[in-house]
Amino acid sequence: MALILFFERGIWPLVPESAVVSSLFSVTIKSEVNDLELISAEESLVAVSFKPGFIIKETPSVKVQQPSLGVLSKACSQLEEYFRGKRKHFSIPLRTNLSIFHASVLDEVLKIPYGEVISYQDLAILIGNPGAARAVGSALGKNPIPIFIPCHRVIGSDGRLTGFVGGLDWKRYLINLESN
């Protein structure tokens, strides 16, 4: 049985049905904008939610538990450093269950330097699919691990802030944080 992510823009499997995951661990942290929920499976970060308590649905084979030390503790520490302007890169094991196209988009997003932004069109060109700016935007809207996979660094071709899973207030906050 698969574990499912519920987001405002749809649902999709958090981990493949073939994966053996008996427990997820969840922790909620405070930030200047609002609370964030971080979720791990085994020793990998699998999701970040801008709406704590909204992201996951337990199944008979998977239970959500309070965090163990390990990846969530490290993720919280690194996120706090990031919010204080002391960290520009994360070193957390990430785990996603995405299509090849979505994975290629997110892999390229990981290469965008801290403090820089690029357009959806430029990102489409970088992945070798120049006509796919809208598909790139759709893939970014399904990023299960925002901030750690910095999709907030992608903006409209005209420089405007557009779509972000956490909302435009979060996107603006993160871009401003990185520009200072």
Could you say what each language-model-derived stretch is?
Residues 2-131, 177-180:
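Basic nucleic-acid-binding alpha-helical/helix-turn surface characteristic of O6-alkylguanine DNA
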Residues 134-143:
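Regulatory, non-catalytic segments
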Residues 147-154:
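Short Lys/Arg-enriched helix C-cap and helix-to-coil transition segments
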Residues 157-180:
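…primarily DNA-binding HTH/wHTH and HhH modules…
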